[in-house]
């Protein structure tokens, strides 16, 4: 990303003059400089490239690219791109066009302009004012031969597509109306202009000739106060008109001739002219944003890329966010269809649903390093950066697209907007945060004011969105999920075991508040020792439960006083190393895995100065913290839930030592739970890591911890960047957030992962509605998961673990055995199979079919349901083979 700076220009001019004596430096100085201060070849993004030349026309549009499946077309009048499906004839447009509003005569012109835009940006000016620009109103409409604001270029060799560069910004041409001109400049302009331009130039300037020799003493004093160099040059002072008139002169007559007489921008030309005149006037920065977008036609659809390091704008403006193709595929003709959004497991939104509500869903969940941002509460997490839309058309049949964000998703979110009385068409698309900031209130001033503090640097990386097009029977959420599954797992081997898994999670050492002679202190207590964990495991096996994998938390001590230097050490009160090794081997002998949980991301906040050197920070400079659970359980506890976030670089530097510690126990796998459920940015000045860059470092941690996938891995929730490494995922969402405009939840995530990664929903014995969670687990192909401890409920009193008060294994043993027996009866045999289809048979009955031919029917209703002579009990399920 590049910004324009006056200081850089001055420095370069001085250097250039010095070098002229040695190398003959050119007098043309590039004023673009990268924000990171690195040396680089400065290139004007707007003019760099080979001009696009169409290979022909089709349907009245320029042909950009063509392959066996699709044709990419461009309307050069408004920059709209169309992808035509050769098989169905259906056309996907990057944005709406004028003809889409034929039945909307009363639509607001501003709303129409939004729909007709490919880009929408938000920036903040020097006063902190939020301003929104869209590419149609602020680029396409102002584009003409004299004022180019949209340019078309070829993609690099070997790529089929087009690069469109937009100059998106405000027209403040009146500010560039010259207050005066030297006589020489006037004459140069006059010669370069056409007859109408000459007339206008004379009209504004010819009567204003000022020469020091002809001025009276009184006039000299007055004129010199304004134009200090009047002794050296004769000038024409302007006779200014209205703002509209002056802007028209600049736009219609001055801009077209500047390229003929000057190698630079209008602003640079005028600044040099004012310097010659000795006229002190600082020209305003132009709120103009140069944004390049690369569109590449592929065999499967369209790839869209925005290289944010090539964005250009004045440094006095802060580009906060950028929407890329927010109206791609928007349906306007009343057809039926659904938007597919990554809300939890996935959700459908009918495109004909009207609602005043909308939602923005951040990919990979909330960034807890940004505390003042508004996030919707109680939302299920988005774990896959994808979204889609399907439409059924009477002429073209069923068509759909699924979009997958492959770079920049750490900065991104997807926005879903049902139609309203003002916005007549539903739409969804991605937004990316370019320059994060926090808002604070200044309480010390006479009147409280909001202050903005930005990260030291904006995000400078790629944004890439791949659109895959589907038709016919594949044009629904199932086809979309299969396409995404093939992207993540197309080259992976499936699971080998078909037996249903049982996940048993337990806790070792905790701290609880106790008192001695009136003094409160934190005493160590054991929820489940190693010997007790073994006993529970043996009892579960005796009860008929098999294929058990164990997650052992707090085996190095209470996680709320975690220290990364302590990770990998066995807490003394839990048992011996030999006992731990024996338990690990026992579980593995039976075909399962014992996953000791390694908390690599979070540390206890000690308050010491050294914490700042190896912990992540928020924008305002304080340490980034994370609680991970509701503060409702915090009452009376002396150990805070909030822990500090460890820098990814610090984790990588200590990881070899941690792995060596684990090798001494013979562990074949670990749980890195937090790494799969949270993604933290770091705003340390020296180690600034935007969320997208943090994602890449997380992947490095996963790669190193698992020795490139040789070790088994368990994570929580399962953000998609863990898919290459995860064997087991706990707490996968089994539903959506139940937003008012959502039609229903869908197993999108499960269709993507089933057969390749084992997973479970939330712990059954901690669920608010155990029966519903069990039914959902069966419908979505999830394994069973219980949290079981040896300690009695009273053990968690006055601790950070009050939420575990009902996890004593004696309380849940019989139910766990019964649940496993019932669920394994229908899910055994499908664990290595992908989900082939998912159907709603009636209001409360759903059927999931696997590629091996097995169908599992789940009845949520209160009455028995019959399917092809198979009876499905109320609140029950059956397998049909």
Which role does the model predict for each range below?
Residues 547-549, 593-595, 668-671, 712-714:
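Structural preference for beta-strand elements that scaffold enzyme active sites
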Residues 74, 79-86, 103, 389-429, ...:
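Active-site-proximal substrate-binding groove within the catalytic cores of carbohydrate-active enzymes
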Residues 21-24:
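C-terminal motif of bacterial Sec signal peptides marking the signal peptidase cleavage site
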Residues 476-480, 485-487, 529-539, 644-671:
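An active-site-proximal structural segment forming one wall of the substrate-binding cleft
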Residues 498-651, 677, 681:
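Aromatic-lined carbohydrate-binding/catalytic grooves of carbohydrate-active enzymes
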């Amino acid at each position: 990303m590049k910004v324009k700076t006056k200081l850089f220009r001055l420095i370069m001019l001085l250097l250039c003059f010095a070098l002229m004596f040695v190398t003959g430096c050119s007098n043309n100085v590039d004023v673009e400089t990268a924000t990171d201060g690195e040396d680089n070849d400065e290139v004007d993004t707007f003019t760099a490239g080979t001009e696009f030349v169409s290979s022909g026309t089709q349907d009245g549009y320029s042909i950009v690219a063509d392959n066996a499946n699709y044709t990419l077309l461009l309307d050069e009048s408004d920059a709209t791109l169309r992808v035509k499906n050769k098989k169905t004839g259906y056309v996907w447009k990057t944005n709406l066009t004028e003809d889409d509003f034929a039945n909307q005569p009363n639509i607001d012109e501003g709303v129409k302009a939004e729909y007709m835009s490919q880009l929408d940006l938000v920036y903040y000016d020097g006063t902190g004012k939020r301003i929104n620009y869209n590419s149609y109103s602020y680029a396409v409409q102002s584009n003409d031969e004299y004022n180019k604001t949209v340019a078309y270029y070829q993609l690099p060799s070997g790529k089929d597509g087009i690069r469109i560069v937009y100059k998106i910004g405000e027209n403040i041409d009146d500010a560039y109306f010259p207050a005066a001109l030297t006589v020489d400049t006037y004459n140069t302009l006059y010669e370069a202009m056409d007859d109408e331009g000459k007339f206008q130039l004379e009209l504004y300037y010819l009567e204003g000739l000022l020469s020091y020799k002809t001025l009276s003493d009184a006039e000299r004093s007055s004129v010199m106060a304004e134009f200090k160099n009047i002794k050296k040059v004769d000038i024409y002072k302007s006779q200014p008109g209205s703002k509209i008139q002056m802007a028209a002169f600049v736009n219609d007559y001055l801009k077209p001739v500047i390229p003929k007489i000057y190698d630079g921008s209008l602003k640079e030309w005028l600044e040099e002219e004012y310097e010659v005149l000795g006229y002190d006037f600082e020209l305003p920065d132009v709120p103009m944003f140069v944004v390049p977008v690369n569109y590449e036609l592929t065999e499967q659809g369209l790839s869209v890329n925005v290289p944010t390091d090539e964005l250009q704008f004045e440094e006095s403006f802060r580009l906060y966010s950028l929407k890329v193709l927010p109206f791609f595929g928007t349906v306007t003709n009343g057809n039926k269809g659904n938007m597919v959004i990554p809300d939890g497991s996935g959700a459908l939104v009918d495109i004909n649903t009207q609602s005043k509500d909308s939602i923005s869903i951040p990919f990979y969940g909330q960034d807890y390093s940004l505390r003042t941002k508004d996030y919707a509460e109680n939302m299920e997490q988005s774990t896959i950066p994808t979204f889609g839309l399907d439409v059924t058309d009477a002429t073209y049949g069923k068509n759909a697209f699924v979009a997958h964000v492959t770079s920049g998703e750490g900065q991104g979110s997807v926005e879903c907007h049902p139609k309203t009385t003002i916005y007549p068409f539903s739409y969804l698309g991605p937004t990316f945060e370019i320059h994060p900031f926090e808002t604070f209130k200044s309480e010390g001033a006479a009147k409280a004011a909001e202050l903005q503090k930005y990260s030291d640097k904006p995000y400078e990386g790629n944004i890439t969105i791949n659109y895959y097009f589907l038709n016919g029977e594949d044009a629904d959420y199932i086809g979309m999920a299969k396409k995404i599954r093939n992207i993540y797992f197309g080259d992976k081997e499936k699971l080998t075991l078909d037996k249903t898994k049982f996940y048993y999670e337990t806790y070792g050492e905790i701290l609880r508040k106790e008192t001695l002679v009136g003094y409160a202190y934190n005493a160590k207590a054991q929820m489940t020792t190693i010997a007790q964990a073994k006993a529970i495991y043996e009892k579960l096996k005796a009860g008929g439960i098999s294929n058990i994998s164990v997650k052992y938390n707090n085996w190095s001590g209470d996680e709320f006083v975690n220290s990364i230097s302590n990770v990998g050490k066995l807490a003394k009160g839990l048992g011996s190393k030999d006992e731990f090794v024996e338990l690990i081997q026992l579980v593995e002998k039976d075909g399962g895995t014992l996953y000791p949980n390694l908390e690599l991301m979070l540390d206890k906040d000690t308050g010491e100065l050294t914490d700042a050197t190896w912990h992540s920070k928020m924008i305002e400079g304080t340490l980034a913290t994370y609680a991970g659970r509701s503060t409702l359980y915090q009452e009376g506890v002396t150990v805070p839930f909030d822990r500090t976030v460890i820098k990814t670089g610090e984790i990588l530097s200590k990881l070899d030592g941690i792995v060596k510690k684990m090798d001494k126990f013979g562990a074949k796998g670990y749980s890195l739970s937090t790494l799969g459920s949270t993604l933290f940015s770091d705003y340390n000045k020296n180690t600034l890591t935007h969320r997208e860059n943090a994602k890449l470092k997380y992947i490095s941690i996963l790669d190193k911890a698992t020795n490139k996938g040789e070790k088994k891995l368990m994570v929580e929730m399962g953000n998609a960047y863990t898919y290459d490494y995860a064997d087991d995922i706990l707490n996968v969402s089994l539903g959506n957030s139940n937003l008012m405009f959502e039609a229903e939840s869908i197993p999108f995530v499960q269709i993507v992962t089933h057969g390749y990664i084992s997973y479970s929903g939330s712990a059954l014995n901690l669920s608010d509605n155990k029966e519903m969670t069990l039914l959902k687990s069966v419908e979505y192909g999830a394994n069973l998961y219980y949290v079981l401890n040896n300690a009695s409920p009273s053990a968690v009193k006055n601790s950070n673990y009050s939420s575990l008060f009902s996890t004593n294994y004696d309380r849940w043993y019989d139910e766990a055995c019964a649940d496993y027996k019932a669920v394994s009866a229908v899910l055994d045999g499908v664990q290595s199979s992908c989900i082939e289809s998912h159907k709603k048979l009636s209001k409360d009955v759903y059927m999931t079919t696997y590629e091996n031919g097995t169908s599992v029917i789940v009845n949520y209703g209160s009455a028995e349901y019959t399917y092809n002579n198979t009876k499905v009990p109320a609140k029950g399920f059956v397998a049909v083979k």
